[in-house]
C-alpha cells in the first residue's frame, strides 16, 4: 500500500494537504481527494475502506462508527463516492477523521445493474494496478472520468468498461498493439491476437492458441482506446463482443489474475 508518509511538503503533495506534522517532519495526518473502491465490515460499527486518492495512492483506512444509524459520514464512504477525505496516519491502517462528499457517483449508477457492474470491474482493476504504485494520479483521474461517464449514461456501460480497461492498462505500460505485429513489427492489419505476445501478431509470429478475431474487432478496440465513440458505438455487435473478450483476456494476463467482478459480469 502506498503510504502518505512520503508527502512531506505542500509542493510534493500536488494539491493534497498535510494537516499535521510529526516532530521528525513526516506527515501525521493528511487530506486528499479520493474515490472509494471497496468497504468491509470491521467489528460491530466500523468499516475498512479502500480509497484511490489523487496524491497518496491507494489508502486503506478504518472509518469508525460509520455503520451506526447516526454516523456523520457513513453514506459518503460507499463504493464509487468521490470524496474529500482526511485521515490520521496509523501503524497498519489509517483512521478516517473527516469526509466531505464531492460527487455522489454511487447514487447515479446504483439503480442500473449494467452500470454498477461495470463500475465494480473498474474499481477492482484500479485497485490491482495501483497496489504497488507510488504514483497513482493518472489512474485516479482516469477512473474518476470513467465512473462519471457511467453515472451520466454517456455510453453503453460495456463499451465504457472496455474503453476504461484499455486505457488503464495502457497508462500502466501495457498498451496493446492493435495494427502492426507486436513481435516483429510487420505492418498490419493482422488477424491474430495474443495477449502474451503484446496484441496483434502476423501469421509468422502467431503462437498456437492465439485468438482469431475479425480485423474489424481490432478496429473497434482502437476506436475505444482513442475515444472515437462514433466509430465504437457504430461497430457491429459481433465485433463488440469479440472486442470485449480480447480486452478481458488482455487485462487478466497482465494483472496476472482473473478480475473477479468481470467474471461475474460475463456470466450474466
What kind of feature is each model-predicted range?
Residues 17-268:
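Non-catalytic alpha-helical scaffolds and adjoining flexible linkers that form interface surfaces
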Amino acid at each position: 500500500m502506498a503510504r502518505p508518509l512520503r508527502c512531506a511538503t505542500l509542493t510534493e503533495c500536488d494539491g493534497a494537504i498535510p494537516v499535521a506534522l510529526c516532530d521528525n517532519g513526516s506527515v501525521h495526518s493528511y487530506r486528499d481527494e479520493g474515490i472509494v473502491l471497496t468497504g468491509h465490515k470491521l467489528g460491530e460499527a466500523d468499516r475498512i475502506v479502500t480509497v484511490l486518492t489523487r496524491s497518496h495512492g491507494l489508502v486503506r483506512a478504518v472509518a469508525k462508527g460509520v455503520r451506526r444509524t447516526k454516523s456523520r459520514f457513513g453514506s459518503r464512504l460507499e463504493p464509487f463516492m468521490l470524496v474529500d477525505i482526511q485521515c490520521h496516519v496509523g501503524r497498519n491502517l489509517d483512521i478516517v477523521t473527516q469526509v466531505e462528499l464531492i460527487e455522489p457517483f454511487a447514487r447515479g449508477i446504483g439503480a442500473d445493474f449494467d452500470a454498477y457492474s461495470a463500475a465494480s470491474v473498474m474499481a477492482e482493476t484500479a485497485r490491482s494496478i495501483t497496489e504497488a504504485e507510488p504514483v497513482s494520479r493518472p489512474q485516479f483521474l482516469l477512473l474518476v472520468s470513467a465512473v462519471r461517464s457511467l453515472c451520466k449514461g454517456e455510453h453503453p456501460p460495456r463499451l465504457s468498461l472496455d474503453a476504461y480497461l484499455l486505457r488503464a492498462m495502457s497508462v500502466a505500460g501495457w498498451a496493446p498493439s492493435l495494427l502492426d505485429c507486436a513481435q516483429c513489427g510487420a505492418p498490419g492489419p493482422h488477424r491474430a491476437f495474443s495477449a502474451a505476445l503484446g496484441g496483434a501478431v502476423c501469421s509468422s509470429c502467431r503462437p498456437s492458441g492465439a485468438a482469431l478475431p475479425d480485423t474489424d474487432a481490432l478496429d473497434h478496440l482502437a476506436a475505444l482506446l482513442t475515444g472515437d465513440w462514433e466509430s465504437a458505438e457504430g461497430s457491429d455487435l459481433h465485433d463488440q463482443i469479440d472486442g470485449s473478450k480480447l480486452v478481458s483476456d488482455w487485462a487478466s494476463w497482465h494483472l496476472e489474475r482473473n478480475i473477479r467482478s468481470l467474471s461475474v459480469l460475463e456470466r450474466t
